[in-house]
Amino acid sequence: MEYKRFKTRQIKVGNVLIGGDAPISVQSMLFTKTRDIEGSLEQINRLYFAGANIVRLACLDMADARALKEIKAKSPLPLIVDIHFNHNLAVYCAEFIDGVRINPGNIGSKENIKEVVKACKERGIPIRIGVNHGSIEKQFSDKFGYGVDAMLESAMYNIKLLEDLDFFDIKISMKTSDAQKTIEAYERLRPLCDYPFHLGVTEAGTKFHSTVKSSIALGNLLLKGIGDTMRVSMTGELEEEIRVARAILQDSGVQKSGVNIISCPTCGRIQSDLLSAIKIVEEKTKHIKEPLNISVMGCVVNALGEAKGADVAIAFGKNQGLVIRHGEVVAKLKESELVDRFLAEVEDEVKSRAVKE
């Protein structure tokens, strides 16, 4: 299936381009209190090494805002401030931050929005209109309830507000906690504007539930060419958010990066400790950013066939096995030696590609 992405306007968050032909960026949000400068920077650095492109932080009051200024000066990643209720915090943070997210449901009057727009325009930073089904403006929830219709009305109303103020550095999110409603919201808004979309399922839950919901919603939208930046929301799992997001991009065929591991589900034919092997391989290869297909198979039934399509593969047998690279057997070893040799071949494959580039 040919992937064709919806062409959107391009904006910039720090040094990261969003929309247009730019790669789809991956975001996360800290769960520290922003006034905890050391703790916040520690989480930002973890996200940086995990492969995040952009980080968002909550700002509840001026103590957070002042801390955010110091955090921004030391951050390796662009930062977005997440504002609810108090528009003055957005105005203050616009002086040094890379982007502002406002919630139309609680930011207040048109005058409040006008002040935020003025501050962001002066700095040349974008605003995300973050529509959330749980906090729709009363004028729309009274008329439409808390469903997709109300979200669409809110989005279009706030887009027009910003456009009437001659502001167009906009991105939009349409988040619900339900995968189907999230898909519907983004699909229905897409023909109505050409601003970049930030994809996400809000309040998606813990690792298991979030992975399922986000894979369904975000994967579905990405395959339809919808989405310019994304977050996999996950309760308390910073690095996993990035890992799952990158996996969704890779397995949907939208953006190749990192290791794609092919491994069998195991059955009665297995005569080796495949589960231990795959855990080691997964842990030892998670740092790799180069697109790489590797195969770890437990018996000969499908192992050789899978190996033909893999860059590096293991085919386990009884107490021994094969290490295969680009379809060619490079070693036949006893089981205790297989994983180490396999990982050495993986690292050599990565290095050889770097030399060619």
Curated annotation (Swiss-Prot):
Function comment: Converts 2C-methyl-D-erythritol 2,4-cyclodiphosphate (ME-2,4cPP) into 1-hydroxy-2-methyl-2-(E)-butenyl 4-diphosphate.
Gene this protein is translated from: ispG
Organism encoding this protein: Campylobacter jejuni subsp. jejuni serotype O:23/36 (strain 81-176)
Similarity field: Belongs to the IspG family.
Keywords noted in UniProt: 4Fe-4S, Iron, Iron-sulfur, Isoprene biosynthesis, Metal-binding, Oxidoreductase
SUPFAM superfamilies in alphabetical order: Dihydropteroate synthetase-like, Nitrite and sulphite reductase 4Fe-4S domain-like
Cofactor(s) needed for function: [4Fe-4S] cluster
GO biological process: isopentenyl diphosphate biosynthetic process, methylerythritol 4-phosphate pathway; terpenoid biosynthetic process
InterPro entries, per the entry: Dihydropteroate_synth-like_sf (IPR011005), IspG_bac (IPR016425), IspG_bac-typ (IPR004588), NO2/SO3_Rdtase_4Fe4S_sf (IPR045854)
Superkingdom of origin organism: Bacteria
Top-level enzyme category: oxidoreductase
Positions with a binding annotation for [4Fe-4S] cluster: 264, 267, 299, 306
Protein name: 4-hydroxy-3-methylbut-2-en-1-yl diphosphate synthase (flavodoxin)
Gene3D superfamilies documented for this protein: Dihydropteroate synthase-like, Sulfite Reductase Hemoprotein, domain 1
PANTHER family per UniProt: 4-HYDROXY-3-METHYLBUT-2-EN-1-YL DIPHOSPHATE SYNTHASE (PTHR30454), 4-HYDROXY-3-METHYLBUT-2-EN-1-YL DIPHOSPHATE SYNTHASE (FERREDOXIN), CHLOROPLASTIC (PTHR30454:SF0)
Enzyme Commission number(s) from the entry: 1.17.7.3
Catalytic activity: (2E)-4-hydroxy-3-methylbut-2-enyl diphosphate + oxidized [flavodoxin] + H2O + 2 H(+) = 2-C-methyl-D-erythritol 2,4-cyclic diphosphate + reduced [flavodoxin]
Leader sequence residues: none
Pathway: Isoprenoid biosynthesis; isopentenyl diphosphate biosynthesis via DXP pathway; isopentenyl diphosphate from 1-deoxy-D-xylulose 5-phosphate: step 5/6
Cofactor annotation remark: Binds 1 [4Fe-4S] cluster.
GO molecular function, one term: 4-hydroxy-3-methylbut-2-en-1-yl diphosphate synthase activity (ferredoxin)
Bilayer-spanning residue ranges: none
